[in-house]
Amino acid sequence: MKKEIQFSLVYRDMWQSSGKYVPRKDQLAKIAPVIIDMGCFDRVETNGGAMEQVNLLYGENPNQAVRTFTKPFNEVGIKTHMLDRGLNALRMNPVPADVRQLMYKVKHAQGVDITRIFCGLNDPRNIIPSIKWAKAAGMTAQATMCITYSKVHTAEYYINLAEQLIEGGAQEICLKDMAGIGRPAMLGTIVRAIKEKHPDIIIQYHGHNGPGFAVASMLEVARAGADVLDVAMEPLSWGKVHPDVITIQAMLKDAGFLVKDINMKAYMEARSLTQSFMDDFLGYWIDPKNSIMSSLLVGCGLPGGMMGSLMADLKGMHAAINANLKKKGEKELSEDELLVELFDEVQRIWPMLGTPCLVTPFSQYVKNAALMNLYSKSMDEKPFTRMDPAMWGMVLGKSGKLPGELAPEIIQLAKDTPHRHYGQGQYGLSPRQVLP
């Protein structure tokens, strides 16, 4: 009997991996029936991540937007899912426990079936309470492992993490390969090990296309026993976003898997509608570079989901750095040259900062530190002289335990800098206490 693979259309992340904003409520109401008509999706990502935040930024009520988008899928039995930042809920900073507990009741009432709970530190303490609250609210708790590639993040590391999350009550496991740098063979090893011990646990794979591994990774995890794959569709597929459902469906069908057919007439209609939303106003926030893959991402590991904000930040800093270089009579940098320098600096400082998974909010913290280091360099200042409070909160354990070790110079800098007020966060200081 053929193994069935289901598809989830990550319509929310398609947009936020391309730019900043998501469609308005009226636009979501238009696209939902067409997504249903495509006939190939068992799940749709409707909200979470930064969706609710950006709704507020352009004056729309996110509660109404979520209800509007989930309703058509609820009526036909397509499961809806949201992205949930664990300790941070839908924010960039820690949220009180009672508010997080209430969030699951609210989101379930708004029509969301599954919550994908993740922590950029992969700290089970940030995920397991949310598993219990989500289940109590009637949602399916999908515990997430943020995938990256480092000396710390081995197959054994992830297999052990999955075991802790399943023991903590997780009903499903998501491999969130947010930068697409998980190596296909390693991902297959992880999925196979989980399935051998827990055959009834649903495994969903989420991969970004940026560095080019994602298609191979999807085939590998499917062969290892994964149940659901996250996919995108044109005009917001490929590039630094996600693989397109057409390609993945054809690949898996040829490989002997049971996959649903795609109604191509509906696909083209959804494609046209999505393009019209871009033409309306959303396209102004999509950098053309996000439609281009880059092997430079293999080394730095920055996630596809932050490429929109990264390019906006880079443009803002580009002029300031060049102004400093010009004052010193040094050669100015092109935007591409600065981008390569940024990737190199991220790769250099990431292990120094404890090797957090480069996913929201820690990808922003590490990227910001790297960008400010480049600015400091243009000012002839020492590195890490412009670290923001959020970075110190991560270093001092405010959001949980860092996966790796802090570099000695970061520990010394922490001791020399008056940031003791960050010692009392969700957990106080990390076990690698950096202050006397």
Language-model features, listed with the residues they occupy:
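Conserved, mostly hydrophobic/aromatic
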Residues: 14, 117, 173, 225, ...
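N-terminal amphipathic alpha-helix/helix-capping segment at the start of soluble metabolic enzymes
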Residues: 1-18, 66-71
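Glycine-rich phosphate-binding active-site loops on the catalytic face of alpha/beta enzymes
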Residues: 117, 177, 224-243
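C-terminal helical cap(s) of enzyme catalytic domains, especially alpha/beta-barrels
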Residues: 237-262, 269
